[in-house]
Amino acid sequence: KYKIITFVLMKLLRKIFLPLNLVYFLVVFLRNKLFDCNLLESMSFDFPVIGVGNLSIGGTGKTPMIEYLVRILMAEYKIAVLSRGYGRKSNGFVMSGDSVSSEIIGDEPYQIKNKFPDIIVAVNNDRKAGIELLKKNNSNLEVVLLDDSFQHRKVNPGLSILLTCYRDLYCDDILLPAGNLREPIN
């Protein structure tokens, strides 16, 4: 019964928020146009940067995809994973070490570091600065994997991998706040 009430309440709230979709769309559209016209800077790097992201809120398997890429690449390349570190209690650039906790770097980067102790895992809200600091501190770094990077346009990855959940197709959804999409489909 509780699930039904919650579902109905969420449907009602999304209908109430529907007029705000236009405002959200305009903000996202303008921001993207500023990047597209080079009025806001997007930096590319002279080594491979692979971004993994999605258009919708919620879990689509970004961290498992990062882990899959780590498994593929770590035998051949010196790699680093850079995440925002969602939910962490620290600020700025933090590189994981033996004594770093999930409170300092966030749950998902901590999970990645525990599974792959030989790779570099770092967190920074500013992806551009994070990549620069990773390269400065690790001159032999060859590949950077960006976790949840699709909306962070200050960095232009050489390859972007966009994930979706097979149950929640983009074509069946609308923008926030009435829907789950962070970006317009196009």
Language-model segments: which ranges?
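A transmembrane-helix-recognition feature enriched in membrane-embedded lipid enzymes
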Residues: 7-48
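Alpha-helix C-terminal capping segments
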Residues: 6, 73-74, 116
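Phosphate/Mg2+-binding loops and adjacent switch elements
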Residues: 86-115, 119-186
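Walker A (P-loop) phosphate-binding motif
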Residues: 32-98
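N-terminal, well-ordered alpha-helical segments
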Residues: 21, 28, 50, 67-71, ...
